[in-house]
């Protein structure tokens, strides 16, 4: 026991020395307000959007600002002028923020944004018609699942948004959902992001559900082909659906969606991936490790007749290809070298550089 304690002590001392050195060097040499990640990222991390969303550049290091409160953040994310916004500390919102175009919203190490309202003022970021937005390295906290049947009350809501990259976020306890992509949104990449519910669900909301821990909805109606056909194309890379997630991880209508190197280890799944009307889904080298995830991996949602889903080289479930309708299976043709499914859990759960808001970004 004493050897283990000594080992941990010296490990902490060494890490402290390293961080002190980085802080010292950075304060002396970095005077242009560019951020640095002081802990090396995972060797599997591309550090850029891949596939759908690959052309997203966000604020492109222009008009750099640091925000520390809700008023500053609301002002910084508005409008269409390019801006790179660093979030410092803990920010609490009273209502959802409308995010404009050409923005990078990046959390410095440990940054959180929360909105704990259980009403129509719930939600954190609304991207309605926005284009070219990056959201990175933020912990986003909602009040817990409570079905109030409100539009756009998720921690992140994309409504007709294009070219969006969400990377290394920890998205928790959304009131309606954690992160929904609807109404013709397109070219979306979600990478290295953790989804979970740590607050017990609350019943009695106007929507009627007693357990609305429904994480990621892609397409919110079967009757929106005029908006959604040819859109809702998304890539999920190295994402982790865990504690408390019940369903919609994701649940897809209309879009082409690739889910690759993702982890499912929660114990509350009613299902993991839901395939609905005109969905075209490619699930590749993912790890379904909990018993619930293995048994409830896929769901044919309400008997929709036009869909394609293919599962390839995953851990915990068999390969399968299911198809109804006259169109062909979507096969990704963009460059991403997926690693083996039996490595997914250890890579994504690495506390130093795995999925979630793990980037040690400093200014």
Placement of each model-derived feature along the sequence:
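Extracellular beta-rich repeat passengers
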Residues: 251-363
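Acidic Gly/Asp/Thr-rich repetitive segments characteristic of extracellular carbohydrate-active
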Residues: 50-86
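Right-handed parallel beta-helix
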Residues: 102-111, 131-144, 160-173, 185-207, ...
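Structural detector of coil-to-beta-strand junctions
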Residues: 123-124, 155, 178, 201, ...
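Extracellular beta-strand-rich solenoid/capping regions of secreted or surface-exposed proteins
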Residues: 74-82, 89-106, 113-136, 142-162
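Bacterial N-terminal signal peptides
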Residues: 13-24
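Bacterial N-terminal signal peptides that target proteins for export
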Residues: 2-15
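Bacterial Sec-dependent N-terminal signal peptides
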Residues: 2-3, 23-42
């Amino acid at each position: 026991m004493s050897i283990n304690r000594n080992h941990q002590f010296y490990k902490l001392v060494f890490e402290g020395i390293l961080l002190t050195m980085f802080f010292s060097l950075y304060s002396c040499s970095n005077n242009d307000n560019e951020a640095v990640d002081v802990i090396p990222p995972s060797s599997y991390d591309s550090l850029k959007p891949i596939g759908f969303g690959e052309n997203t550049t966000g604020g492109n290091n222009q008009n750099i600002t640091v925000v520390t409160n809700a008023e500053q953040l609301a002002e910084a994310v508005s409008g269409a002028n390019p801006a790179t916004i660093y979030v410092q500390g803990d920010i609490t919102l009273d209502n959802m923020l409308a995010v404009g175009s050409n923005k990078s919203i990046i959390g410095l190490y440990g940054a959180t944004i929360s909105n704990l309202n259980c009403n129509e003022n719930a939600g954190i970021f609304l991207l309605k018609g926005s284009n070219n937005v990056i959201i990175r390295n933020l912990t986003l906290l909602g009040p817990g699942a409570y079905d109030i049947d409100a539009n756009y009350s998720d921690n992140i809501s994309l409504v007709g948004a294009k070219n969006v990259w969400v990377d290394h976020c920890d998205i928790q306890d959304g009131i309606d959902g954690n992160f929904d992509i609807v109404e013709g949104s397109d070219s979306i990449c979600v990478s290295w992001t953790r989804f979970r519910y740590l607050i017990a669900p609350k019943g009695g909301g106007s929507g009627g559900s007693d357990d609305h821990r429904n994480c990621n909805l892609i397409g919110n109606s079967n009757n929106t082909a005029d908006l959604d056909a040819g859109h809702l194309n998304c890539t999920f890379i190295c994402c982790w659906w865990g504690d408390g997630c019940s369903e919609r991880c994701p649940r897809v209508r209309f879009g082409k969606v690739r889910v690759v190197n993702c982890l499912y280890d929660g114990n509350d799944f009613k299902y993991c991936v839901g395939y609905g009307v005109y969905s075209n889904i490619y699930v590749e080298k993912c790890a379904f490790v909990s018993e619930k995830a293995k048994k409830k991996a896929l769901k044919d949602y309400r008997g929709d007749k036009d869909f394609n889903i293919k599962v390839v080289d995953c851990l915990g479930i068999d390969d399968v290809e299911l198809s109804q309708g006259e169109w062909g299976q979507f096969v990704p043709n963009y460059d991403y070298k997926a690693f083996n499914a039996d490595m997914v859990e250890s890579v994504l759960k690495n506390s130093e550089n795995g999925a979630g808001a793990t980037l040690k970004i400093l200014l």
